Amino acid sequence: MVGFKATDVPPTATVKFLGAGTAACIADLITFPLDTAKVRLQIQGESQGLVRTAASAQYRGVLGTILTMVRTEGPRSLYNGLVAGLQRQMSFASVRIGLYDSVKQFYTKGSEHAGIGSRLLAGSTTGALAVAVAQPTDVVKVRFQAQARAGGGRRYQSTVEAYKTIAREEGIRGLWKGTSPNVARNAIVNCAELVTYDLIKDTLLKANLMTDDLPCHFTSAFGAGFCTTVIASPVDVVKTRYMNSALGQYHSAGHCALTMLRKEGPRAFYKGFMPSFLRLGSWNVVMFVTYEQLKRALMAAYQSREAPF
């Protein structure tokens, strides 16, 4: 057995909620530069943006984007928006991942045998609910990642200032900009990510190919990351473009998608695919492995605390 052993008592909803948020923050700390590179590649090619996005710099590939940012803006630019990113994960992942099992049990009325329909419904529900809670943090994160440090063109100097500036200049609705594509994206992401992880893990365990241990969690998470990237990339690119756009640049998320298609062609919807996959694949591995271990560690600590002397 590698890592913490599974406990006799299943993890509580609170343990899952806190464990998911904490694990997601750890995953973000490790993979954030890849996410920033993804955002820069996704917005490349826009004729207009809300914040200065180093238009003179041409990004080519994941490594090229990272090296260009380090050379022109410094290493810290790779972590632009990290504070908002951690705020997002603590509120976002806690809901979409931490509540997934509880919502799945609700739809199956407590049955241990959840069908694919119940899993998809649970994933869509928690994904959409998480967006409603965490959208402002996502908007601020994307704005920070998109803006360049070089040449004094930074629009926001701090996370708190970003929230205030957006609310003052664009209204409260500005903080929920891009909610529609984000709801669509996260319903898709959650279904692809959690359901695929669920199914791969169940298949490996039922076929006795692996035990419920780190290698099983690693394999399931990596497979889920690849499937999710393929399915969700088009919506993710539209979401990023729309949230980073200037006031009035796009009338809606649909208008943003049509503009991309007309000006840049279908391939624009898969801009930043490689950093998306590298980020989502590695993020999934770190998050799910950490999440599984945190659940076991927290329940072991809880049981030892409750155990009689």
Swiss-Prot record:
Residues 16-63, 278-285 are annotated as: Important for interaction with long-chain fatty acids. Widely expressed. Highest in spleen, lung, white and brown adipose tissues. 4-6 times higher levels are detected in white adipose tissue of ob/ob and db/db mice when compared to lean littermates. Expressed in neurons of the ventromedial nucleus of the hypothalamus (at protein level). Expressed in thymocytes (at protein level). Changing residue 278 to A: Does not affect long-chain fatty acid transport or inhibition by GDP. Changing residue 185 to T: Reduces inhibition by GDP but does not affect long-chain fatty acid transport. GO terms for cellular component: mitochondrial inner membrane; mitochondrial membrane; mitochondrion. Keywords: Membrane, Mitochondrion, Mitochondrion inner membrane, Repeat, Transmembrane, Transmembrane helix, Transport. It is a multi-pass membrane protein. Proton conductance is activated by free long-chain fatty acids and allosterically inhibited by purine nucleotides. Could be constitutively inhibited by GDP. Changing residue 16 to S: Reduces proton conductance and long-chain fatty acid transport. Retains normal inhibition by GDP. The record marks 141, 185 as: Important for inhibition by GDP. Changing residue 279 to S: Reduces the rate of proton conductance and long-chain fatty acid transport. Retains normal inhibition by GDP. This is Dicarboxylate carrier UCP2.
